């Protein structure tokens, strides 16, 4: 097992200071990161075109023009549009209910769907998308329809574009880590100024959820501030109801971790795999003026009764998530067969080619699952035939190693792919058939040995005397971690006797560190793996084990004890020793 200490620990620093410095924060920003204030927020007027956009929208409302809002198909898109419509409903309830229509994508698609725009529309508003759709903007403009774009995606400035574009990537706005919902919030702040109201801050919960789901960099202090403020006061009916259903897991603790695991995935499941009816139900449940309406119950055994729309929505989201997991399981069987038939596992990078098309919405989830199961960088590619031109395209997932710091860039630099777009370790990729075969040969030559993960750890702990306190201390700061400020990873090295090791129910490995209250657990540990581990004890008096993992506080029957959630471990040597 390979690991690297990010920076030597300095005694003058607290563990939190050390971690935040390791994440690239300047020393003078650490206190501001931990407790951000409104001083971190930038003036919304720094966004180009924001006044023009606000006045254009208000003028359309005052003149009772028909307005269409295009909802983008991900969590950031849904929260962006929900924020805008909820805010406008506070100001102009009759206008929103009578003159503003909105549209959802039937499939996972981004940008304007011109065919869905009602014929009497005079203004189109697109939160979280469409900055690069110049031709659509021109087409609408020629038909007398103006566009307001409230977006954060990269696009080139085109002076011929008739749309009013508010985009932090296309101007000198200092914070590039605001997602679409952040831009909509800034837009509503300007509307507040014009209308002399103060409604925008009431929707910061949607801002927080959207930015967390869209993986915005929390090292940007404005982004951190808006997220912290939003999570302090959850008001949105859908988020509240979903939290109630997941209260055992969330435990009233709203932070980037709980939002990422127990809120955003349910929204994304519906946007990816839901029917149009399910998507409409979800979005309506995010609207304050729709969520608490009584609707005919769809609950089993409750025919003829009514229930709140938001309750129905949350239950439906759970059903869609379960359906998605079932579909994922069925598709995994196809992938396992392909791995066996193609002997893909013989290579140290899994390249899996599937003749039949998969649900594009599941590609990334499947690649991530296979990478985790096989412990190898993974590409899942499906055959595409466009007008007789064959390509292999799909999703790639990787992890940091000593040789490769960025898998997307590595594949791009190989010169064999048509494209590799996305994040360093999660991205879309495409090849021609000829170049794919060349890429396979290149990979096999480059990585003759198994590609070992290289864990970058914040601390190396070997002192039993301080271990319990160190773990409890670091675990108590869980609310501070987020995108680009990842949860600290620690490395422990201790010697274990056979009685310190146990396999609990449901495949949970438990290692109890002698002389401490600390236990280390790993989920999904197989009986065969456990048998092999136990046999090593027969060769000596104990095992010296290195463990890489995350700090946790185990709460049971009112008692709290330090715990390490194991990410990986290795037996360094068999030893003879005296406890």
Identify the residue ranges that each predicted region occupies.
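Residue-level recognition of well-ordered beta-strand positions that form the cores
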Residues: 266, 512-514, 548-550, 567
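Short nucleic-acid-contacting surface segments enriched for D/E, G, S/T with interspersed K/R
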Residues: 528-548
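OB-fold and OB-like beta-barrel modules that bind single-stranded nucleic acids
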Residues: 420-421, 496-497, 542-555
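OB-fold/S1-family single-stranded nucleic acid-binding modules
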Residues: 555-578
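Conserved phosphate-handling catalytic cores of large alpha/beta enzymes
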Residues: 109, 114-117, 124-141, 145-207, ...
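Hydrophobic helix-and-loop "lid/oligomerization" segment in the mid-to-C-terminal part
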Residues: 2-123, 142-145, 192-441, 459-464, ...
């Amino acid at each position: 097992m390979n690991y690297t200490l990010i920076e030597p620990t300095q005694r003058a620093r607290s563990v939190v200071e050390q971690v935040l410095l390791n994440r690239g924060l300047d020393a003078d920003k650490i206190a501001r990161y931990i407790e951000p204030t409104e001083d971190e927020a930038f003036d919304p007027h720094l966004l180009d075109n924001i006044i023009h956009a606000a006045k254009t929208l208000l003028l359309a409302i005052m003149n009772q023009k028909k307005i269409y809002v295009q909802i983008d198909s991900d969590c950031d898109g849904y929260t962006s549009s929900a924020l805008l419509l909820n805010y406008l409903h506070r100001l102009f309830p009759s206008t929103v209910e009578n003159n503003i229509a909105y549209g959802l994508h039937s499939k996972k698609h981004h940008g304007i769907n011109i065919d869905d725009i009602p014929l009497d529309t005079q203004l189109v508003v697109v939160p979280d998308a469409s900055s690069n759709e110049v031709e659509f903007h021109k087409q609408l403009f020629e038909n007398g329809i103006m566009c307001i774009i409230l977006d954060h995606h990269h696009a080139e400035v085109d002076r011929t574009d008739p749309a009013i574009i508010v985009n932090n990537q296309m101007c000198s706005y200092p914070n590039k880590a605001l997602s679409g919902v952040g831009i909509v919030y800034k837009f509503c702040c300007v509307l507040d100024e014009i209308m002399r109201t103060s409604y925008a801050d009431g929707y910061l919960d949607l801002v927080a959820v959207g930015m967390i789901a869209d993986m915005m960099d929390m090292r940007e202090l404005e982004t951190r501030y808006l997220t912290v403020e939003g999570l302090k006061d959850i008001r949105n009916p859908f988020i509240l109801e979903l939290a109630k259903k997941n209260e055992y897991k969330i435990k009233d603790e709203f932070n980037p971790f709980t939002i990422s695991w127990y809120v955003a995935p349910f929204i994304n499941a519906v946007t990816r795999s839901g029917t149009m009816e399910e998507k409409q139900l979800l979005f309506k449940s995010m609207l304050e003026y729709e969520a608490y309406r009584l609707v005919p119950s769809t609950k089993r055994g409750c025919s003829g009764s009514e229930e709140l729309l938001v309750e129905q929505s949350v239950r439906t989201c759970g059903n869609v998530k379960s359906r998605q997991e079932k579909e994922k399981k069925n598709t995994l069987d196809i992938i396992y067969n392909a791995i066996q038939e193609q002997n893909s596992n013989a290579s140290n990078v899994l390249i899996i080619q599937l003749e039949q098309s998969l649900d594009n919405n599941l590609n990334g989830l499947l690649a991530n699952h296979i990478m985790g199961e096989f412990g190898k960088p993974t590409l899942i590619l499906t055959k595409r035939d466009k007008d007789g031109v064959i390509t292999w395209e799909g999703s790639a997932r990787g992890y940091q190693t000593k040789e490769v710091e960025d898998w997307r860039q590595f594949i791009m630099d190989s010169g064999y792919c048509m494209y590799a777009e996305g994040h360093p370790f999660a991205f879309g990729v495409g090849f021609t058939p000829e170049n794919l075969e060349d890429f396979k040969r290149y990979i096999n030559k480059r990585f003759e040995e198994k590609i070992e993960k290289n864990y970058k750890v914040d601390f190396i702990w070997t002192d039993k005397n301080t271990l319990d306190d160190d773990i409890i201390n670091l675990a108590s700061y869980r609310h501070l971690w987020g995108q680009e400020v990842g949860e600290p990873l620690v490395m422990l090295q201790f010697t274990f006797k056979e009685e310190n090791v146990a396999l609990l129910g449901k495949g949970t490995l438990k290692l109890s560190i002698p002389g401490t209250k600390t236990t280390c657990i790993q989920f999904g540990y197989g009986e065969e793996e456990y048998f092999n581990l136990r046999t090593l004890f027969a060769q000596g008096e104990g095992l010296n084990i290195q463990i890489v993992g995350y700090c946790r506080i185990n709460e049971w029957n009112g008692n709290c004890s330090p715990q390490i959630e194991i990410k990986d471990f290795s037996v360094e040597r068999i030893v003879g020793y005296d406890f």
